[in-house]
Amino acid sequence: MGQQVQHESRINVGEATHVSKAEMGANTMFATSRLNSNNKVGPELAYLSGVASSASDSSTAAPSPCYLCHKPAALHVFGLAGRYVFGSVKREAYLSQEGPRSGRTPNRIAESLPVRVVNDFGLRLRVVTNQGPIKPRPPRPIDAIVFASIETRNRLRGFDRSFCCSAPPETYVFLPRARETIVLRANIIKMSSEQQASAGQPVLCASGCGFYGNPATLDMCSVCYRQHCLLNGATMATGPSSSVAAASAATVATGAVTSDSCSVPSAEVNGAAFSSKNNPEPATVVEKKAPANRCASCKKKVGLLGFACRCGATYCGTHRYPEKHACGFDFKGASRDAIARANPLIKGEKLTNKI
């Protein structure tokens, strides 16, 4: 299987420690690089039962009951941009419980697994790279992916914290191209509410009711916004009243534009405005004429059974005819005008050069 490897003396927790390629190969049995199916160069590393071995030996190692929480697992990221995360410990099924798959993008892992900083088994993450002494910016997205995947696998198998030793080893992540990969991990952080709003995603209510809010209502839902307006003493305009107010505002604006366009001296306008303000004219109230409930000839009370004549008066059943109440309305003239309006006279133009 290989020799035991001691890591405590040369790696600091939470830092991306610089390790030369020769030292990495000597201490961790760094496997020879190879071209994968996508023509990208990447190393193969595997830690089984506390022993470093090549990926070809990983299939012969039987996992112990607390295999994932007691023994350090190895992940490796390869490719020019570090797009794929591969697990070389008994295939990827031990890390992401998705079955033996060739690789998963960081976004897919972040979406499918819960984000946690510390798991129940005390695993810690250490980044080993040969690109120089750099610190991850930030390291939390990488930690969350590894912790959540291993923790989910252990919970499904029914493992408990009591099986863990007092000082469990760390989980190592080897990044051959650490700079691009760490920057890519920083993009996995969940967007803030402002970024979600700018991206067009729904934003939760600002009052914390759990429903979605609307930027037009101060990022609150309709119910919370109504309560907010009632508490602040604001009057919420309804649909018809708001439309009437908008129409009146448009009328006022049109009148203002028309008055500005007229060539009237400013002194006269100011004087008229001042006089109208000091001496307001009484408002003319147009009252609707009450319907007559008595006959205009015999003064008999007819109520709702009266007959309205075209002359403008109301009569009973006996005096409703024009010859009974000496009606002065010109029925013939009205009919003649109606016929003339309905049948206009069309005359053709006279020919000037008529032969």
From Swiss-Prot:
Gene Ontology MF terms: DNA binding; zinc ion binding
Residues involved in Zn(2+) 3 binding: 309, 311, 325, 327
Induction (free text): By cold, dehydration and salt stress.
Top-rank lineage group of the source organism: Eukaryota
Keyword match Zinc-finger: yes
Keyword Zinc-finger: yes
Sorted UniProt keywords: Metal-binding, Stress response, Zinc, Zinc-finger
PANTHER family: AN1-TYPE ZINC FINGER PROTEIN, AN1-TYPE ZINC FINGER PROTEIN 3
Task performed by this protein: May be involved in environmental stress response.
Protein name: Zinc finger A20 and AN1 domain-containing stress-associated protein 3
